[in-house]
C-alpha cells in the first residue's frame, strides 16, 4: 500500500473506486483529455473500472491530488516503471478549474521524491504534445530538460501528436 504524502497545499493519496465521480470530472472533460493518450471517458462507470487497475504493481505509482483546504480531489498522477525500456516516466492530469496554479508540479515533485528514495531512481522521463504548453511548463519546473522530438498516438489510434521527450538525471 502506498503511503499518504503531503505537500504545502495537497494531500497525495491512493485513488479508490469511490473516487470515480470526482475523477470523471477530468477524465470525461475534452479540455483535459485533448492531449491524453487514452480516449475520452464517456461515463463514470468506465472510470470506476479504470480505478480498479491502479496501484496493482509497486512500480506503477498513482496518487490522487487532494486540496488540503477543501478536501476536494482535483487530479491524479504518478511515476511508472517501463520494464521493456528500463525507464521511469511521469504522467498526470488535473481538473480544468485547477490548471495554472502549480498543483501538478507540487504533486509530481513529491511523488518523484518518494519513488526516487524507494527505488533508487537515477533518471526520469516525460513526454508531452508540443502544443501542450502547460505540460511543458510542469516538466521544466521539475528540472527536466529537452531530450528529443518524438510522437505518440492515442490508444485507439484516433490521433497522433508531435511531441517532445524530456529527461531529468538525479
Q: What are these model-derived regions, one by one?
A:
Residues 52-64:
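A short helix-loop-beta-strand connector motif used in the catalytic cores of GNAT acetyltransferases and
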Residues 31-52:
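Conserved GNAT-fold acetyl-CoA-binding loop/helix
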Residues 1-34, 62, 66-170:
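Acyl-donor (CoA/ACP) binding surface of acyl/acetyltransferases
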Amino acid at each position: 500500500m502506498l503511503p499518504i504524502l503531503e505537500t504545502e497545499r495537497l494531500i497525495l493519496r491512493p485513488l479508490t473506486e469511490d473516487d470515480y465521480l470526482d475523477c470523471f470530472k477530468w477524465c470525461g472533460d475534452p479540455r483535459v483529455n485533448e492531449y491524453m493518450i487514452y480516449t475520452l471517458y464517456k461515463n463514470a462507470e468506465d472510470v470506476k473500472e479504470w480505478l480498479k487497475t491502479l496501484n496493482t504493481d509497486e512500480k506503477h505509482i498513482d496518487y490522487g491530488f487532494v486540496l488540503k483546504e477543501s478536501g476536494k480531489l482535483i487530479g491524479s498522477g504518478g511515476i511508472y516503471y517501463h520494464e521493456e525500456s528500463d525507464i521511469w516516466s511521469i504522467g498526470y492530469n488535473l481538473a480544468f478549474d485547477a490548471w495554472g496554479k502549480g498543483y501538478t508540479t507540487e504533486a509530481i515533485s513529491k511523488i518523484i521524491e518518494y519513488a526516487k528514495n524507494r527505488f533508487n531512481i537515477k533518471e526520469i522521463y516525460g513526454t508531452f504534445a508540443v502544443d501542450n504548453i502547460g505540460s511543458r511548463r510542469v516538466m521544466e519546473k521539475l528540472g527536466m530538460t529537452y531530450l528529443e522530438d518524438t510522437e505518440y498516438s492515442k490508444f485507439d489510434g484516433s490521433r497522433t501528436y508531435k511531441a517532445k521527450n524530456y529527461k531529468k538525471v538525479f
